[in-house]
Amino acid sequence: MAADDGIRILPLAGIPEIRIAADLGALIGDAIERTDGALPLSDLDVLVVTQKVVSKAEGAVIDLTGIVPGQEALEFAQRYDRDARQVQVVLNEARRIVRMENGVIITETPHGFVCANGGVDASNVGPDSGSLVTLLPRDSDASAAAIRRAVRARFEVDIPVIVSDSFGRPWRWGIVDVAIGVSGIMPLEDLRGSPDADGRVMRSTVRAVADEFASAAELALGKAAGRPVALVRGAAFTRGDGSIRDVIIPGVNDLFR
């Protein structure tokens, strides 16, 4: 579904610093009510929520003061001027180490994501965070579903929810926001077998729709503006019981493993 009058991205203002065990769904609901132009909610809306606030609300946070680094972490940290405790957390959270080189650790997470530092991050944890780092949510689809249920119960509108995070990309500098959890939306649009604008049959085109929503929302949210949630209104998507697992390429099909 899509609107005829273009796409709008509406950052939700007034969401406070998220604490562990905060009712994130209720806080997002409060912000929706305060946001001019965002109401009434529409079935053309998609809610994008950044990973950091989800992780904090769910308690996916580790205090580095309790971490004892092993020899591998100590050697890597000394060589590249890293915090050995944080390196150890990255190693602990990894299903598989892809590369450890030039101060960068690329891991495969238990979710199947391949990313720098396994999603372990000390940025935007909070002004009094001290030695805290956040982890990725254990089940980002479930996180998205919980927020979706809270919004639906409050506003009686069922809008899809995407949890987003910043990932780097091979062979390109810079990061972009991608989806790491979805609820109520199909994360991919398979166009294979459909004709293109010239009538040619597309053979390999599969759009990463959820990633596109995540990146679009980031244009309005920014990295340091303290705005972790946005409504994306009017963009085309397909409703359904999609999972972020749908976007993970199986090992047998992955040319880079």
Report residues per predicted region.
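Phosphate-interacting basic helix/loop segments used at nucleotide- and nucleic-acid interfaces
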Residues: A22-L39, R138-I159
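Conserved SET/PR domain catalytic loop and adjacent active-site segment
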Residues: L27-I28, K56-A57, R169-P170
